[in-house]
């Protein structure tokens, strides 16, 4: 099942990966982004 995370101000890929129990690489692959991309509050990310 696909799950989503809504980015809030101050979050990073690292903090989201820890919170959701997935790797940064998994988040990047599912969302077609790179580690260096800036996240925006309100952005929706898939994480599983």
For the regions a protein language model found, what residue spans apply to each?
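Primarily a LysM-type cell-wall glycan-binding module
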Residues: 1-29, 40-47
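Short, small/polar residue-rich loop motifs at catalytic or cofactor-binding pockets
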Residues: 32
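Short, surface-exposed secondary-structure edge patches
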Residues: 35-37
């Amino acid at each position: 099942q696909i799950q989503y995370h809504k980015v809030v101000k101050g979050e990073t890929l690292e903090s989201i990966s820890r919170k959701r129990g997935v790797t940064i690489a998994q988040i990047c692959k599912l969302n077609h982004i790179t580690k260096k991309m800036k996240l925006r509050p309100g952005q929706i990310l898939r994480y599983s």
